[in-house]
From Swiss-Prot:
PANTHER family per the UniProt record, alphabetical: VASCULAR ENDOTHELIAL GROWTH FACTOR, VASCULAR ENDOTHELIAL GROWTH FACTOR A, LONG FORM
Pfam families: PDGF
Keyword Disulfide bond among UniProt keywords: yes
GO biological process, one term: vascular endothelial growth factor receptor signaling pathway
Name this polypeptide is given: Snake venom vascular endothelial growth factor toxin 1
Amino acid sequence: MAAYLLAVAILFCIQGWPSGTVQGQAMPFMEVFERSVCQTREMLVSILDEHPDEVAHLFRPSCVTVLRCGGCCTDESLMCTATGKRSVGREIMRVDPRKETSKIQVMQFTEHTKCECRPRSGRVNSGKRKRNPEEGGAESQVPLGLTSF
């Protein structure tokens, strides 16, 4: 057993840890950059958020994975936006607590197929504040989504 653990440790030292980096070292810039760009990525979405008219039922699981656009654009005036979408089915257990019944059924969810960085439309106030040096250190409102990240 000790020989096996030593072999695994040596292999990780030679090839790197599964995350793509050697333990204790920083992730390389190109890997960080590639992971952060605007692209489709698997995300969890709440079934009730996607189907708000279904509040009379319970769902198992209560959320599902779908591809959605996410990531950073090169300019803060741009936002990662879905330019292609499709409907996908997921098998969900629908529970009716009043009747004490349940059944497996297919529910439809929107999945993103293509993403692009596009100009932000409409500014919504998020309540975040940013220092405005021109006003003697007073704070000014920052529109939603115009902060880093």
